[in-house]
Structure formats: C-alpha cells, structure tokens
C-alpha cells in the first residue's frame, strides 16, 4: 500500500537523529502498537522511498490518537533497541542541550545513541606484538630453541619498552612474517589488536594499593556526600583536594554508599587515556557491576555496554565526556573527576557541550548527587562553591602514606648566563635524573610540544616553512622524516629543494624542540636509559596509550616523557621526580584562561611525583621566575591564585562574572568572510538585549586553517537562552551565504585559537 494513504490508530511524535530542529509525526503500525512507548528508539524514513541502510534513528516523545498530517504520514519502520527506552531525564537533557548549546535537536540526539555516535567518531586499528610468557619463562625458551631468528625476536621483545607492531618488529630484527606466525602458534608471543587491550581484564593490572586509613577530611567529605545520597535531593559538591589527598578513595566510599541504596553511578574521566587505569581500580572493588563506555570501543562493544546499562545489568559506568549520556536505571550519583580539564568540552562536532555542566544538569533532572573533583578547580566551579550554590569539601593534605613533595624553581635566565647558550636541561635537572636512575626510581618529564624540531627555516633568507593550507609553522618529526602541520595534519615527506621565499637552493636550519628531541637528548645524556614517550604521535592507535602506561607502571622504563596527557590523574608509585621543562610557555597566549590553564597544568604535573612511601621532588624550569601564576603553582596555593585571578576576571567582565558566546565565521575568501561577519554583527547589535554586550570582530588566533579563514566576535551575557533566541532571529534575517559558515560556541574554553 502507498504509505501516503496508509491510516493508523495511533501516532507518535518523534525526534529524528538528523540535522533538523523540529519534532515529526509518524504512524505506529498495528504490529508495533504494544511495543512502542515513550522513550522507545525506533527507525523511521525521512524520504518517501528508502532502503534499510537509509532509515534514521528516532526517539518517541509522545503517543497520540490523531495527527494534523494523517493524510501524508509515514509509518515507523521498526524498533531499534528492543526493550530499551530513554528515561525522562535524558529526554529533558536533549532539549536543554539543544537550547543552551545552540544546536538542532536532531544533531543533539546523536550524542545519546551508541550507533549514531560511533559513526561520527572513528579511530585507527593496529596490532601489537607482546611476549606470550613472562620474562623468566621467555629466557628459558630462548635457551631451548635453535632458530636464531626466533631468538632475535624474543630478545627484542624482552628489551623493548614500547609496543611494537609486526611490521616494526620485522624491520628491527630482519625476519619474515613466518617467524612471527611460528612463535605465535607456539604461544611464545601474542599478536593482539590494540583495541582489545582496552577491554581485557588481564591487561588492567597495576600497583594495587593497600586499603588506606581515611583522614578526618576524607571522612567528613564522605559523610556530607552520603547524606545527599540518602535524601535523594539534587546537590552538587565540589571536592577540592590537593594532588595525592585521596579523592579516589572518597569516590570509592560514596559509590559503595550509592550502590547500597540501589542507585547507579556514572564516573567521568577527562580522556579515554585515563579510563583503563580508573577501570582497573573500580573493577577490583565492584567487579562485573562496572562497565566502560567511550568512542574508541567498537560499535558492537559500545552498543552492548549501552544496552546492559539501560537494562540495569551494569550499574557503574566509567568513561570520558560521552559517557554522561548513557541511560542508567535509578541514576543517583555522577562524579566528574578532574572537573577543570578542557577535554570535557566537545570541540570537534556540534553541539559544543561542556560535559561538566551537562553532568550538573543531568543530576538536576534526575535528583542525583553530583561530585566535581579536582586539585585545581575551574574558577567557575570554585566561585559556585564559595557562593554556596555548590557544597564544598576540602582535602587540604596528602594522604597519610604520602611524604610532602619538595618543589623547586629553576631560573633559566641564570642558567643561560652560566652556559652562554640555550639549553633545554639545566644541570640541576640532569643531576636529579641521574640520582633517580642510580637507585631505580622513575622520572616524569613534561614538555607540551611534540615533534623533534618546531621551526624549520631557509638558511639564506630565514623564511620559516609554513603549511600551505594553514597559518601554522611546520614541525619536523624525525621518526617519520616528515614536516607536519599540527592543525590540518598536512605531511610533507619529499625533500624541499628550493625556498618558496628567495627561490634559492634550500638548505634547512632546524630550531626549537619537541618531545622527540627531548627523548633523544636524554638518550645522549644517559645511553642506557629506558624511555617512553607519550604524545599524540605515539598514542594514535587504539590501545597504544594503555600499553605504554602499563609498561611504565610495571617498571619497564625509567623516564616517561610527554605532553599534557601525562598530567592527568596518573598514579605511579615509583615516580619520585617530576620535571616541567618550560613552565611559562602557556603564559604567552593572549587568552583570558591562559594563567588558569598554566596553573592547573603545573600543579597537576607536580602531583605525579611522590605519591607513595618514597619522597617526591618537582623541578620547574622557567624564564619568568617572578610570575605570580608560577609562584602560586610552586607553592601549590590555589586559594591565593584564585584570589588574584578573580580580580582580573571581574575587572574585564569575564567568566565567572558573565557567560560567553563565541561566533566564528569560516570561509575560503577572507574578505567575503569578513563582510558576512560584519553583516551578522550589525544585525545582532540592533537586536541584542541591553544586559548583553557585543565585542568587536577580530581574526581568530589561527586565522587560516584548512584553507578557511576565521573571524570571530564574542557576546557577553548572563542569560544564554535569551541571547540564543536573539541570535536565531538574526540568523534567520541575515540568510548567510552558503560560502560562509558560522559556528556558535557557548562557554568556549578559549577565545583565541
């Protein structure tokens, strides 16, 4: 029968996972009437004739017995997730996110469905080779076999501190794939899809601590949060605890309390990288009740966990920001660990939500207790706690097993005067690393630039090589022998023979340093040192981050070198030295959050040292030893930093005293993009609420990215929803050219890049 003439007894109002901002009516076929309920996930057509792979996912919002479009209505094609319905708190959250973050309802819905979300987030797969037996047994195997190629492979794996792909191992040992196949069949090696490292329990073994004796501050925090759980009233608690103060132990105890009350739990961590270490700890205590959810899982893994949580078979979900959208039965507790972290802000695809704030709103919709934990709270959260909007629990001392860490500042101006040249490592740092190597203790070195050389120029005219598609200087990556753009990933692997500026024969000069060079220098200083480098180059494949962390945690390397990802919640009991090579680099960025982010980063890095019975030391190298942000970070004095920073925020009317809306215009023609931005700016100026203020248009910090030019302006307001409505009216009136795209970012974490 032609669906345009089909009649139905019942109709459903549904929200479709497409880039549309309205609710549509569909007919409910007779065979689905008993199975479709409010919150059901269904499949619907958006066009008259569709194939099975063209159906869209949708959520049923309302069931009714009539429709204004009954004559042309199409039927629901089927139920996608049988027996699973989205709870009311999630449906309310969809509408709130859409309104607040200025995003169509259909695009917002994609966050909440596992299949749709996984289709928009892809990742790379890679196999890694591991020993099939422990080191002692492998040594015995080497003595028992005669094939020199097999022996070479096993010896290489015994020595390596980094996961190797089959291709890398074949190249390093000069063997064929048959050798690897033979060793694998005998059980002497394992060839594992790196993705599986994230879900195999046997891979989740780290140093397991003895149950600690709780401090009085921990007991008070646990009691405060437990009382909130018992009353079943929405409450947000800021758990402000210095690094090593035992916030995780507080999480453990309140999760136990929530489970004893029959309530489920969501625990957010900033990045997938932290999920495995956190999962290991909580699986040890709660076993099969715990599930992990993030975009790097396969579609089937993600969907399976989502279904189990929706049915109450998993009651504790751990994951990065996307885990906040998991349907849970009787959700009673939401924990946002490292709540200050910028990774909670989605920046790649709309809606550009802040998961910390979404967590608070979900807690409100479901009457749950929300914990925001950090050693360096965001200024917004700390202000909310001081104003009593949130309750405040403070852990001011390190846990009883921790010895206070010694923190020292190294003035690199003086070091350069002594050496009369630029140096990356001061003598003090070299001596301190040497002392750790001598006694078998570990060191973490933080340097927030990747690659080998960060500046490559013509030796004749000094022209610096830039990306042809962006206004970004190219970085030399020695491992791959390429020049790489860190904005658009353009790779130049062929030698450059003539200078684009002077057209002379190109002789390159290399300057600047990244983590690759830091690793190379350390190996020059200490030829026998075992290093692991942790940055986006070494962790691009699924599971590679976890494999590297496991190697370091089990003592297979002496020094961990990395970018900001090493600052986030890692727990390594054998680390007694943390080094910040360039403590002031982030302060040169013209962004209102720059000082806050530098303070947070230095404080978090220093917290990686001395987390067990061994005394820790932190060394911070800087060219700005008198800078107050660095001084406060050196003293680990967040209240003093807050007191100073909040004065500047208030004087300039920046968050937390207002909220920001950032409108970014992108187009291939710089002049035309600016014209459209000016036209939109004028329309908004005419209609803007008197309580809001409109800032001038300016080029973005990265003006050209992927051949698109970027302009922006900011709106300051206390009422986002009101201004969003005025923005929508302005967009409707402006009818922007299809050649220019506008991105609206609510509560941006940066106003520069």
Swiss-Prot record:
Helicase ATP-binding domain boundaries: 228-395
Residues the entry annotates as binding Zn(2+) 1: 458, 461, 499, 502
Chain positions recorded as ATP binding sites: 241-248
Binding-site residues, Zn(2+) 2: 467, 470, 485, 488
Catalytic activity: Couples ATP hydrolysis with the unwinding of duplex DNA by translocating in the 3'-5' direction; ATP + H2O = ADP + phosphate + H(+)
Cofactor note: Binds 2 zinc ions per subunit.
Entries under SMART domains matching the protein: DEXDc, HELICc
Keywords: ATP-binding, DNA replication, DNA-binding, Helicase, Hydrolase, Isomerase, Metal-binding, Nucleotide-binding, Primosome, Zinc
Gene Ontology, cellular component aspect: primosome complex
Keyword Phosphoprotein in annotation: no
Subunit structure: Component of the replication restart primosome.
Function: Initiates the restart of stalled replication forks, which reloads the replicative helicase on sites other than the origin of replication. Recognizes and binds to abandoned replication forks and remodels them to uncover a helicase loading site. Promotes assembly of the primosome at these replication forks.
Name assigned to this protein: Replication restart protein PriA
Species assigned in the record: Chlamydia muridarum (strain MoPn / Nigg)
UniProt gene name: priA
């Amino acid at each position: 029968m032609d669906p345009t003439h089909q009649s139905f007894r019942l109709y459903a109002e549904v929200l479709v996972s497409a880039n549309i901002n309205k609710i549509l009516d569909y007919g409910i076929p007779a065979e689905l009437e008993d199975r479709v309920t409010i919150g059901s996930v269904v499949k619907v057509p958006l066009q008259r004739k569709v194939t099975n792979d063209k159906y869209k996912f949708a959520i049923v919002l309302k069931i009714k017995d009539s429709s204004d479009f009954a004559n042309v209505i199409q039927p629901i094609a089927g139920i996608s997730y049988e027996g699973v319905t989205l709870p009311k708190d999630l449906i309310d959250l969809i509408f709130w996110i859409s309104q607040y973050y200025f995003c169509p309802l259909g695009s917002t819905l994609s966050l909440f469905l596992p299949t749709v979300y996984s289709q928009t987030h892809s990742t790379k797969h890679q196999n890694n080779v591991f020993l099939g037996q422990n080191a002692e047994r492998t040594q015995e195997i080497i003595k028992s076999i005669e094939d020199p190629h097999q022996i070479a492979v096993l010896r290489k794996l015994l020595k390596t501190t980094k996961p190797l792909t089959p291709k890398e191992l074949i190249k390093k040992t000069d063997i064929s794939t048959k050798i690897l196949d033979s060793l694998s069949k005998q059980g002497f090696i394992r060839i594992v899809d790196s993705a599986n490292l994230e879900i195999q329990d046997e891979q989740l073994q780290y140093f397991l601590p003895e149950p600690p004796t709780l401090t009085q501050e921990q007991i008070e925090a646990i009691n405060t949060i437990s009382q909130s759980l018992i009353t079943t009233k929405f409450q947000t608690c800021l758990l402000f605890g210095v690094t090593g103060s035992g916030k995780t132990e507080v999480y453990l105890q309140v999760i136990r309390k929530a489970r004893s009350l029959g309530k489920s739990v969501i625990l957010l961590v900033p990045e997938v990288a932290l999920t495995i270490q956190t999962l290991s700890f909580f699986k040890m205590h709660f076993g099969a009740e715990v599930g992990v959810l993030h975009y790097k899982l396969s579609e089937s893994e993600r969907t399976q966990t989502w279904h189990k949580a929706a049915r109450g078979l998993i009651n504790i979900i751990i994951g990065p920001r996307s885990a906040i959208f998991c349907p849970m039965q009787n959700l009673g507790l939401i924990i946002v660990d490292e709540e200050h972290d910028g990774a909670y802000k989605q920046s790649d695809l709309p809606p550009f939500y802040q998961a910390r704030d979404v967590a608070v709103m979900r807690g409100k919709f479901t009457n749950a207790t929300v914990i925001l934990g950090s050693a360096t709270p965001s200024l917004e959260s700390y202000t909310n706690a001081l104003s009593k909007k949130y309750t405040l629990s403070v852990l001011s001392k390190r846990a009883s097993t921790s010895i206070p860490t010694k923190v020292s500042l190294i003035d690199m101006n003086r070091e350069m005067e002594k050496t009369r040249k630029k140096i990356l490592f001061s003598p003090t740092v070299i001596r301190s690393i040497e002392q750790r190597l001598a006694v078998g203790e570990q060191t973490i070195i933080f340097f927030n630039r990747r690659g080998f050389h960060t500046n490559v120029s013509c030796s004749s005219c000094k022209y610096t090589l830039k990306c042809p598609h962006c206004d970004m200087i190219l970085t030399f990556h020695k491992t791959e022998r390429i020049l790489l753009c860190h904005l658009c990933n353009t790779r130049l692997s062929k030698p450059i023979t003539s200078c684009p500026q002077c057209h002379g024969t190109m002789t390159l000069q290399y300057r600047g340093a990244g983590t690759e060079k830091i690793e190379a220098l350390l190996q020059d200083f200490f030829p026998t040192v075992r290093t692991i480098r942790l940055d986006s180059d070494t962790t691009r494949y699924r599971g590679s981050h976890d494999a590297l962390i496991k190697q370091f945690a089990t003592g297979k390397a002496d020094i961990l070198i990395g970018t900001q990802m090493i600052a986030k919640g890692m727990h390594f009991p054998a680390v007694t030295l943390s080094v910040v090579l360039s403590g002031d680099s982030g302060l040169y960025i013209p962004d209102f959050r720059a000082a806050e982010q530098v303070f947070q980063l230095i404080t978090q890095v220093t917290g990686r040292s001395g987390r067990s019975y061994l005394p820790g030391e932190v060394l911070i190298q800087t060219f700005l030893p008198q800078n107050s942000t660095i001084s406060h970070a050196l003293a680990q004095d967040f209240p003093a930093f807050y007191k100073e920073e909040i004065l500047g925020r208030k004087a300039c009317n920046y968050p937390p005293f207002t909220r920001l809306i950032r409108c970014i215009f992108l187009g291939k023609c710089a002049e035309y993009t600016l014209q459209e931005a000016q036209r939109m700016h004028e329309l908004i100026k005419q209609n803007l609420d008197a309580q809001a203020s409109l800032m001038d248009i300016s080029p973005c910090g990265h003006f050209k990215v992927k051949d698109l030019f970027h302009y922006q302006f900011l709106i300051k307001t206390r009422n986002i929803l009101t201004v969003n409505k005025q923005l929508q009216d302005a967009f409707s009136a402006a009818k922007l050219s299809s050649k220019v795209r506008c991105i609206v970012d609510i509560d941006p974490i940066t106003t520069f890049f």
